[in-house]
Amino acid sequence: MRLSRFFLPILKETPKEAEIVSHRLMLRAGMIRQEAAGIYAWLPLGLRVLKKIEAIVREEQNRAGAIELLMPTLQLADLWRESGRYDAYGPEMLRIQDRHKRELLYGPTNEEMITEIFRGYIRSYKSLPLNLYHIQWKFRDEQRPRFGVMRGREFLMKDAYSFDIDEAGARRSYNRMFVAYLRTFARMGLKAIPMRAETGPIGGDLSHEFIVLAETGESGVYIDKDVLDLPIPGTEVDYDGDLTPIVRQWTTAYAATEDVHDGPRYEREVPEERRVHTRGIEVGQIFYFGTKYSESMKALVTGTDGVEQPIHGGSYGVGVSRLVGAIIEACHDEAGIKWPEAVAPFTVAILNLKQGASDTDEACERIYRELSARGVDVLYDDTDQRAGAKFATADLIGSPWQVMVGPKGLAEGKVEIKRRGDGSRENVALEDAVARLMA
């Protein structure tokens, strides 16, 4: 993509309403625009990141055996009355009437609807286990939306729902999602730590939040620092095998949010030199809620004994749009964003330091064509901005690699390559630049 043809409305001044780093940088880098309190338009740069995060989430859900569908944003209020949550959910739920006076709501979550879909088709234990997921926009009418996409009213979520004949099967499904989440966040360059958590309005008796450590996080957390060195399961992980050892390894070391923190146990089990008290950002949460919804909504299947019984369920959420902010909180410096390569809007930024000069134009075009032909996402700054402005833009939007092409370097047959993550630089021969970036 040529920057001269791309829509990138960069702001020179930081908007006053931006309280945290991710909100400031997303506004300044032209990733989002606020349309109402807690509601944002996703501009091209931000949308590219959002789509890459969504793709990783989808790949890992599919790998773990979940099956994608798509549920509507609007739901019937009667479904929520069946489960008993319509009145209990509170003012965060946006309630709507259509022209026929039917009561609807803009779904804040989907346990009721997925249970209704399940009970409409599944009758026997032979169809289980089953895990269905979707990626959809949701709305919760936060009393005080703040922190940009970190605590907005409209947000993109991945929700998965598992259905099993008994508790043992449901816990196996829970473990699959637990491991899938470890892999999902690691692929995005994040170390997300699973922590025992409250179940809240979802219900049930088992839940883990996946927390990314960040000073601006909304949750206080207490951890044994040994958890930071635990290995992430590789691509060879067998989701049909016994995942209990992996889950046990990650849940044995102490890690808890403030809501469930056990001070005496923490001091008893964790040596003082390994205690870490900091803050974190929740990027996902998983729940086992047993028969909470299947009993109230009559989602029954015939078991091996021929008797109808309620299924055991779980739900598994990932905040897809929230992850954009969380990654920025974890990956930035004073100049701007430092995207992990897997989610960067553009992997390589080419900076033409003397636009209009035949030698720099030709060199930039050559690198641009060769990288694009190899499927690399490239942003070529072919504008007539001064070099300093181009450097500032490149650092702000955070492409992992920058290629600086100027007349002084080309006189020696070289271009400069900068790694945004650590700031390291190297001069390479023009003919070797593409190979170096592809290495």
UniProtKB/Swiss-Prot annotation:
Keywords attached to this entry: Aminoacyl-tRNA synthetase, ATP-binding, Cytoplasm, Ligase, Nucleotide-binding, Protein biosynthesis
Disulfide bonds: none
Compartments, record wording: Cytoplasm
GO cellular component: cytosol
Highest taxon of the lineage: Bacteria
Main subcellular location: cytoplasm
GO biological process per UniProt: prolyl-tRNA aminoacylation
Catalytic activity: tRNA(Pro) + L-proline + ATP = L-prolyl-tRNA(Pro) + AMP + diphosphate
EC number per UniProt: 6.1.1.15
GO molecular function annotations of the record: ATP binding; proline-tRNA ligase activity
Record-linked InterPro entries: aa-tRNA-synt_IIb, aa-tRNA-synth_II, aa-tRNA-synth_II/BPL/LPL, Anticodon-bd, Anticodon-bd_dom_sf, Pro-tRNA-ligase_IIa, Pro-tRNA-synth_IIa_bac-type, Pro-tRNA_synthetase
Entries under Pfam families matching the protein: HGTP_anticodon, tRNA-synt_2b
Free-text function comment from the UniProt entry: Catalyzes the attachment of proline to tRNA(Pro) in a two-step reaction: proline is first activated by ATP to form Pro-AMP and then transferred to the acceptor end of tRNA(Pro).
Stated family: Belongs to the class-II aminoacyl-tRNA synthetase family. ProS type 2 subfamily.
HAMAP family: Pro_tRNA_synth_type2
Quaternary context: Homodimer.
Protein name: Proline--tRNA ligase
Source organism of this protein record: Nitrobacter winogradskyi (strain ATCC 25391 / DSM 10237 / CIP 104748 / NCIMB 11846 / Nb-255)
Lineage: Bacteria, Pseudomonadati, Pseudomonadota, Alphaproteobacteria, Hyphomicrobiales
Chain's gene name: proS
